[in-house]
Amino acid sequence: MRRNCNAGFKSPVQSPSSSSSGRGSEYSLQKEVSELQGKEAALDQEIAQLESEGFSMAELEEHITLLHEYNELKDVGQMLLGRLAVLRGVTTKELYAEFGMNLED
């Protein structure tokens, strides 16, 4: 099978103008913007509700930061247990038992 190397390239990706009419695309974008504005309003309302219940955004951000730090430390601990298990020729499950840890820890 021989192909013409001088033929023009035809992209499999359709350009936005060729995939749908201008009006349909504009309507679709307006609908999407409207839906996003509705979601934003709902989230703003939820934030206001939480703040009225005594929650603060700063406290939430601090909590999220601490959760990220905890998860990173947990990942490092699991990696070290895995390496130790390989060096000892045992399973990590056995190491968890040796150190008095639950598998869910």
From Swiss-Prot:
Coiled-coil regions, chain positions: 28-54
GO cellular component: nucleus; Swi5-Sfr1 complex
Keywords annotated in UniProt: Coiled coil, DNA damage, DNA repair, Nucleus
InterPro entries: DNA-repair_Swi5
Highest taxon listed in the record's lineage: Eukaryota
Compartments in which it is found: Nucleus
A GO BP annotation: double-strand break repair via homologous recombination
Chain residue ranges for the region called Disordered: 1-31
Disulfide-bonded cysteines: none
Low complexity bias (residue ranges): 11-28
Residue spans crossing the bilayer: none
The protein's role, per its UniProt record: Component of the swi5-sfr1 complex, a complex required for double-strand break repair via homologous recombination.
Family statement: Belongs to the SWI5/SAE3 family.
Subunit (UniProt): Component of the swi5-sfr1 complex.
Protein's name according to its UniProt entry: DNA repair protein SWI5 homolog
